[in-house]
Amino acid sequence: MTFRDRIHPQLRDWYDASAGFDFDHLETFVPKCNEAELANLKEDPQVVTYDRTIPGPAGSPDVKIRVYAPQDRESSALPCLFFYHGGGFLFGTVYRQEALCQRYVKHVGCVVVSVEYRLAPQWKMPAPLEDCYAALPWAHENHEELGIDPQRRAVAGL
């Protein structure tokens, strides 16, 4: 059975239009995408970026987050944007929308917390969603360290 055979019939036209995307060999395709994302990272001198590991959901692995903050802060308590990268919970990394997260920091004046959630098919739902949620209470409890206002939070993703 191919990947196409497992797709709902109403979505097969979309699949057929996705020529060049090797759905049947995700185990090799996904690492290539991740390598390409890492190779294209560009630092922005106006944005401080660092990685952290936070406690995962109960009984689950810890979760990696990537934090983006303004180099020159105007406040010690900025709004926080929780950002979830695209990829349909199947592929992608926190690096996928690095430039977009940097733009949010510069143009919105916020701190961005991007979550490296677990991916399918290695992890079944609701594991990715649980990882995404784990960042919310963690950031609330650690708002002073992050320099965020716990009352001004938003969620975004692609």
Where do the language-model regions lie?
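Gly/Ser-rich "nucleophile elbow"/oxyanion-hole loop immediately N-terminal to the catalytic nucleophile
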Residues: 140-156
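Gly/Ser-rich catalytic serine loop of serine hydrolases
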Residues: 123-126, 153-158
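A glycine/proline-hinged amphipathic helix-loop "lid/cap" segment
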Residues: 1-67
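Alpha/beta-hydrolase active-site loop
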Residues: 123-145
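Short amphipathic alpha-helix adjacent to the substrate-entry channel of hydrolases
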Residues: 95-115
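Serine-hydrolase catalytic-loop signature spanning alpha/beta hydrolases and amidase-signature enzymes
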Residues: 83, 88-91, 95-96, 112, ...
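Short beta-to-alpha linker loops that shape the active-site pocket of alpha/beta-hydrolase fold enzymes
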Residues: 71, 116-120
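Short beta-strand element of the alpha/beta-hydrolase
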Residues: 65, 77-87
